[in-house]
Structure formats: structure tokens, C-alpha cells
Amino acid sequence: MVELKIACKLDGSCEKPRYRKYKCKVCGWVYDPLKGDPSQNIPPKTPFEELPDTWICPVCRGKVGKESFEPLDEWVEFDE
């Protein structure tokens, strides 16, 4: 499940969906969904929640996976 944060105004218009950045608790590397992870063929605009279960931290390499990442209070928007 992808966690979205959407803000809507009283007139019914809404802002673009926003996606969280995640930080490795071991090395501090930050996954930015706007950039993806080219080292593992993860394209830009891939939310963290949609990364495959086999994805690993590109800095720690094989030592830690998604379970070692924590959500940050930093969000990015995807342009259509």
C-alpha cells in the first residue's frame, strides 16, 4: 500500500499526491522516490512501498533491505 498525502481545498481542487522519502537506519542513505535507484534499475517516480522485496540499500549492499529503512517527514511530488 502506498502512503499518499493529498491536500484538498474547500473549492474541491487538490494538490498533487506526495510520496515519502525513507532513510537507511544503518548508513543514513536516503531513498528519494523522485530519483528511484538507478543502481538497481528502479526508475524515477517509484514510491518506496512499490520497491521489490529483494531491493537492498545501495550503500550497505546486501547487508540491509527495506526493513532497515524508516520514513522521513520529507515528501516529494510527482509531475504527470
Curated annotation (Swiss-Prot):
Named cofactor requirement(s): Fe(3+)
Keywords: Electron transport, Iron, Metal-binding, Transport
TM annotation in the entry: none
Domain (Rubredoxin-like) ranges: 19-72
InterPro entries, per database record: Rubredoxin-like_dom (IPR024934), Rubredoxin_dom (IPR024935), Rubredoxin_ET (IPR050526)
Record: residues binding Fe cation: C24, C27, C57, C60
Cofactor annotation remark: Binds 1 Fe(3+) ion per subunit.
GO MF assignments: electron transfer activity; iron ion binding
Pfam short name (any one): Rubredoxin
Family matches, as CDD domains: rubredoxin
One Gene Ontology term from the biological process aspect of the record: alkane catabolic process
Highest taxon, organism lineage: Archaea
Entry-linked SUPFAM superfamilies: Rubredoxin-like
PROSITE patterns (UniProt xref): RUBREDOXIN_LIKE
Function description: Rubredoxin is a small nonheme, iron protein lacking acid-labile sulfide. Its single Fe, chelated to 4 Cys, functions as an electron acceptor and may also stabilize the conformation of the molecule.
Family as reported in the entry's similarity comment: Belongs to the rubredoxin family.
Stated name of the protein: Probable Rubredoxin-1
Species of provenance: Methanocaldococcus jannaschii (strain ATCC 43067 / DSM 2661 / JAL-1 / JCM 10045 / NBRC 100440)
